[in-house]
């Protein structure tokens, strides 16, 4: 199994070096698809050995699928710029490379952090995400926010991706409000009446808030 690592970026200079170096430990190549960053993201990625391409942002799912098109290999490990691989995941992926795999994808546990705090409550752990997949069989769905890979034969491995989800409480609240608005818009597109949208959005916000309160305990 040869693997191409992919990362989509936009002004990710703070974390991109860590992400690229992390993927290099399991991948034969690293692809960075950048959305017109105005900082040093592309320069840092290229210096670290990544192949860098530019594509105006198409939305989360379409952008990640587009990144896979630049990959030389069928097997893709998709990593977000603010993520890195834990040692247990690196060891696991390197151990399965030499086996004939009949599955189309692998899902991994994700450790989400707010600052230095590991968020475990409100569904934030184990937070399985499918990131290693055979692009000839499956790929990212077309959602513009929080897209996912839906494999038909997925192995759920108990190893970890590290995710620096939020830098601070302020960033958490800002993103919570943004995603609540996205949820309402998507429900409206799907035909849900505004009167029915409000309780759902409140529920989404409450879930994020409860997890936030747990971090502060």
What are these regions (language model features)?
Residues 1-21:
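N-proximal low-complexity "stem/linker" segments adjacent to membrane-targeting elements
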Residues 136-195:
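Catalytic donor/gating beta->alpha subdomain of glycosyltransferases that bind UDP-sugars
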Residues 208-217:
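Single conserved hydrophobic/aromatic residue that forms the stacking wall/gate
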Residues 88-120:
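Conserved donor NDP-sugar-binding/catalytic core segment of glycosyltransferases
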Residues 22, 34-42, 80:
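A conserved acidic beta->alpha catalytic loop
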Residues 17, 39-48, 88:
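Acidic helix N-cap motif at the loop->helix transition within catalytic regions
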Residues 56-71:
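Glycine-rich, basic loop-to-helix element that forms the pyrophosphate-binding segment
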Residues 76:
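Short aromatic/hydrophobic "clamp" motif used to bind/position activated sugar donors
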């Amino acid at each position: 199994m040869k693997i191409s690592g992919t990362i989509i970026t936009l002004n990710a200079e703070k974390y991109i070096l860590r992400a690229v170096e992390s993927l290099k430990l399991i991948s034969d190549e690293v692809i960075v698809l950048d959305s017109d960053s105005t900082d040093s993201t592309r320069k840092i990625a290229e210096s670290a050995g990544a192949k860098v391409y530019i594509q105006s942002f198409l939305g989360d799912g379409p952008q990640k699928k587009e990144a896979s098109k630049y990959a030389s290999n069928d097997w893709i490990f998709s990593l977000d710029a603010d993520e890195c691989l834990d040692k247990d995941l690196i060891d696991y992926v390197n151990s399965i490379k030499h086996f004939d795999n009949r599955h189309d994808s692998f899902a991994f546990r994700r450790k989400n952090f707010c600052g230095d705090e590991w968020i475990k409550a409100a569904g934030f752990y184990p937070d399985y995400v499918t990131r290693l997949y055979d692009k000839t069989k499956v790929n990212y769905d077309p959602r513009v926010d929080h897209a996912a890979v839906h494999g038909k034969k997925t192995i759920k491995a108990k190893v970890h991706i590290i995710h620096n989800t939020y830098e601070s409480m302020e960033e958490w609240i800002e993103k919570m409000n943004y995603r609540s608005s996205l949820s309402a818009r998507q429900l409206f597109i799907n035909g849900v009446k505004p009167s029915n949208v409000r309780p759902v959005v409140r529920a989404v916000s409450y879930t994020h808030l409860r997890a936030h309160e747990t971090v502060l305990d």
